[in-house]
Amino acid sequence: TSRRQRQMCIRDRNKPKIAVLFGGCSEEYDISLQSAASVIRNIDGNKYDIINIGISRHGVWHRYYGPADLIESGAWESYYKCPVAFISPSRDVHGIVEFTSMGTCCERIDAAFPVLHGRNGEDGTVQGLLEMAGIPVIGCGMLSSAICMDKDVAHSLVKSVGVSTTPSIVVRKNDDMHDIVLKASKLIYPLFVKPARSGSSIGICKVERETGLASAVSSAFEHDTKVVIEQAVNGVEVGCAVLGGCSEPITGAVDEIDLISGFLDYEEKYGARTATIRVPARISESLEERIKQTAKLIYRTLECSGFARVDMFL
């Protein structure tokens, strides 16, 4: 693109340009839309120039000029002004390339906020593109995102610094099912079978006895080629937000997830049919402080930056 074409897209340089990325070629596409709509509504437009970049379920990138309501409803692609656009890996561009009726034009971005969930967005792929382009990333970077997305790798790292993890095994899609069942026999039922690199509890099954293991593993392999099988933890799930960027990370209040039955699957996580989130958690001050310190340790161990949420069991 020529310098003149690039100048076509220049806006008010007094306000930093923040690109909000949403959607994505992921099973968690719908959740990303809900999150992005909330983020967009809460960014101060008087301070920042918001550039919305939507990624379709099929992986097509667009510059979206419409309201947040259409993102939330899932109808954003039908908006009349939604041209194809993408983030250029070139540091010379340092932003997006947009295809318009007048040709292509470029617009510089000061920072990018990937509000993407799951594979192809939360796993380091988009973060790597942004880092290569020289665009600052709001949230965790490429390495941390990739580490946190893989349950096996994340658990191994936090275990190495003294954080307790439940006994587990890792199996691969080309493993013989008989060998998988035999390998899992050293664990105590009930077990949880989880795709190693899937979020929002998608593909997770709770298995009460050995007869149900093969079916659960086959189901998990539909979402990933790597599966974690772990012992269930009989405890209360707690968690807190951690915010970095300063010498000492800041933690939010500790919350507690109160479940009447079952586990926190996709429907419970986003529909809260029977789950109740209690803030603050019903715990002692000393235990709350221990949880916060453990959350900070995990945050540092997994190389997190910006904001993160750390969950654990008591």
Enumerate the language-model features and the residues they cover:
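Short hydrophobic/aromatic-enriched beta-strand-loop microsegments
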Residues: 136-140, 165, 250-251
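Phosphate-binding site of ATP-dependent enzymes
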Residues: 208-293, 314
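Single conserved hydrophobic/aromatic residue that forms the stacking wall/gate
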Residues: 1-12
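ATP-binding N-terminal substructure of ATP-dependent carboxylate-amine bond-forming enzymes
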Residues: 11-138, 142-143, 147-149, 153, ...
